[in-house]
Amino acid sequence: MQLKNSIRCSSMIAICLFLSACNEAAVKTEGPHVKEVGFESLAKSDIGVVMEIHVEEARICLRTLMEKLYKRNPRELKKSSFPTAEENVDRLFEQKHDWVFPELDGKIGIDAIRLTFTNDYKGDRVFAFISGLSSMIMASYGYKREFFLFDSAEPQNLYNSARNIEIAVWKLGH
């Protein structure tokens, strides 16, 4: 009898410690940026967390690429209606939007990327390129940045996105 009570008590303590740990903020100083661990993380799978990290890392890389492309191609920034590269970058990565921008004539994804390589396009090619890549990647994840237990990404969409990125990078280099 005393052994059963001891096991119950130990189980309750373990459960309480586990639940209280879920409320503590986990802070990482190195590696991929991951949100703090909270109660909502109980409804996430390992694959969901990996997809979140992947989306966030892609966004960070595209943001950095956009900043570098503006530094190397300042003439493209002059074609924009925004005076600084920071404003253009923030507009794409910090503000809420539906990926449809008037200067791209409503084109998103691969259609926006194609504008970059069109000779008669007079707009900001850096914005068209990065906006197209970003919207294509986000579309392959269902335009979500947070994934829970039953969420999934379509493998064919991820594959198509990866192939399109390879083609776009090749075209940019040639």
Segments and roles (model prediction):
Residues F18-A21:
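C-terminal motif of bacterial Sec signal peptides marking the signal peptidase cleavage site
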Residues N23-R125:
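N-terminal Sec/ER secretory leader and immediately downstream segment
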